Amino acid sequence: MTKKVFDDISRLALKALLYEVSLSPKPGLVDQLDNGAHDDMSFLTFVDSALALAPFFKTYLDIGFYHAKEDPGLIFERLRVSGIEAEQAMFSATKGVNTHKGVNFSLALLLGATGMYLASQPQLLAHVTAFTEEDSLAICQLVKPLTAHLLETDFGSLDLKKELTYGEKLFLDYGIKGPRGEASEGYPTIAHKALPFLRKSLRSTDQETAQLQLLVYLMSIVEDGNLIHRGGIKAWQRVKQDMRLLHNSALSATDLKAALSAYNDKLIQQHLSPGGTADLLVLSLYFAFLENQL
């Protein structure tokens, strides 16, 4: 039974990746209509990448489930090792293009946490779509102990480093913690903002429109390192403001798609891509599938 449930959950993680790239139109992002602000990847690149990562999803679950009683730091290291192997498979499939590196990090943590949670909730092994809102929140909270050391390890001695990554520079200059910060705080954007928003939207509109509405909402609130990297702080703040206006406009499904298509043209011209938002959309969809919301 455990194997079947883990296979099912792994498929939901893959499904989340495929739904995200298929959702169209997405401003600045790769989708079925165009490559957004990217000239080195396409829709099929993302499909290849997702399929390359998929075999590792069950490994992440296994690590969390079978090592649930270990020190969380040790579980994290096990997940990190497998995550690096998955990343190498991704780069091999995409010929060196970084399609899913960030979201692979988050999926490793959340699938590992899902495995840990299932070890303490055996009744859920009977039916994969029996997860509740409380289960999703508990899984997000389990990431906290897994990543308790992460900010200190990665950001604690930056003053001693000669060369900094862009994420490290963002932390030093603006205090932006990026995916590490989101993980270390138990994915509050997912648990307390994205999922409640998506659940509410799904009660009043169709699945595709609800996902597009979620994309707009996330773009209006997320600290998106990809946007900042490409355009700077002001460009990111401008996109957030534009999306806040779109979010508050309550457009029909048809008008929303038209507005997103027009904004896609704008971001392509500015070479801006909200990749951080796309990652959080994937994670939101994963939990929506677990809860059988989608």
From Swiss-Prot:
GO molecular function annotation: ATP binding; triphosphoribosyl-dephospho-CoA synthase activity
Record key words, sorted: ATP-binding, Nucleotide-binding, Transferase
Catalytic activity, as annotated: 3'-dephospho-CoA + ATP = 2'-(5''-triphospho-alpha-D-ribosyl)-3'-dephospho-CoA + adenine
GO biological process entries: prosthetic group biosynthetic process
InterPro entries the UniProt entry points to: CitG, TriPribosyl-deP-CoA_syn_CitG
Domain of life: Bacteria
EC number: 2.4.2.52
HAMAP family xref list: CitG (MF_00397)
NCBIfam families per the UniProt record, alphabetical: citrate_citG (TIGR03125)
Identification of the protein by name: Probable 2-(5''-triphosphoribosyl)-3'-dephosphocoenzyme-A synthase
